[in-house]
């Protein structure tokens, strides 16, 4: 088969679950999607666990999802790689970690460990902190090792941070500062938020509490949950200062870039991702910081990597380029790295034949305040590009079900799902009716279909539920599969031979 045009449209965070009063997908008016499922071949995909290179039972996420989608093979994830290193003991002999300790000992300075403290497994993992504590103990530097906590509440229950931090404190960690991820891990150019976290860790600016647990408990009593805990200081002796060493425990890059750049390469923090917006003030940033990133974050982050970046050949975008086809990558800010950097296997340089379309995400504290986000603007930009008739394929992401789903607001997420389905409809109809092309419509993981946990409390994390996949081509049958099977399916539709490196299989059943 050889289609004129084949698109992948990702409804981020829209999974499958039984109808209920906490399922924003089934509560929403999804008539267009329902009709697609009735009219065209469809099936389900696994987006979690070993099918996407994670430990069994571990929920998927957008980074993992887009890596697998673009690679056309199972990509073993950072979480699994680090877990294996801890298990086989190589973690404790890691040269980057050893160099960080050597730097601190040479300068008679401190060793800092920082990152998201939770068992969500999306950006970081509790077990990795315990291993880093054991490492510091082995290296006889515990007396000057400090922990800078970023609380979660997004990939975990909203007030679970207290328990996670208590576990680390009981283990022996000396906590210096605490910041909600809303501040420390912003990725949408909200520099004022990042500034508060950075200044707390480096200058001691912010509220002070006698203990990390006291500060977290105080936030809860004020109605502030983990994600939004305002940066506070526990121990001024543990601030990040000149000549210190830092190990950043986050293994996912997108929300680690800002703080890591500011610490390791302050001059770059003045220009990175500014786009004319207020920048981070690094005039008082500590000097000669030796920063170890758990994984590669971005070129602006200086210092060794604990685990080198995996490299992949013959990714979907590269195969498209080799065949002389032109492609679109489109998303709003929140998911833009996913359709570019992650979909291309961690490669930052745009492919020569690709056009990138970005709609800026709205500047609101939380996306339940604007559940439509920038979906309409993104849709208009995409259709305008498609009207040129220049392209043979497209990767398009609608962020709404996931980003609004993370707020725990059922009604807002219902609206987010409806807007997404509406916009998917506009783009899909144009592809079918104007281009004579085909669209694969799916999700990269679940979220919006489960908005309450078993106790009736807000559920803001991803799920391990199956997700839908539909191909707008009649006369074929779809098998069930995993995200690694999507790139081979796109190539199948375009009449391009799948490279050997792609071990995924086309979802289209061969007759």
From Swiss-Prot:
Please tell me whether the keyword Metal-binding is annotated for this protein: yes
Against PANTHER family, the record matches this protein to: 2,3-BISPHOSPHOGLYCERATE-INDEPENDENT PHOSPHOGLYCERATE MUTASE (PTHR31637:SF0)
Report the catalytic activity.
Answer: (2R)-2-phosphoglycerate = (2R)-3-phosphoglycerate
Q: What EC class does the entry list?
A: isomerase
* Active-site feature positions: 62
Name the positions where Mn(2+) 2 binds: 12, 62, 444-445
Assembly and partners are described as: Monomer.
Which terms are listed as keywords in the entry? Answer: Glycolysis, Isomerase, Manganese, Metal-binding
Per the record, the pathway is:
Carbohydrate degradation; glycolysis; pyruvate from D-glyceraldehyde 3-phosphate: step 3/5
Annotated protein name in UniProt = 2,3-bisphosphoglycerate-independent phosphoglycerate mutase
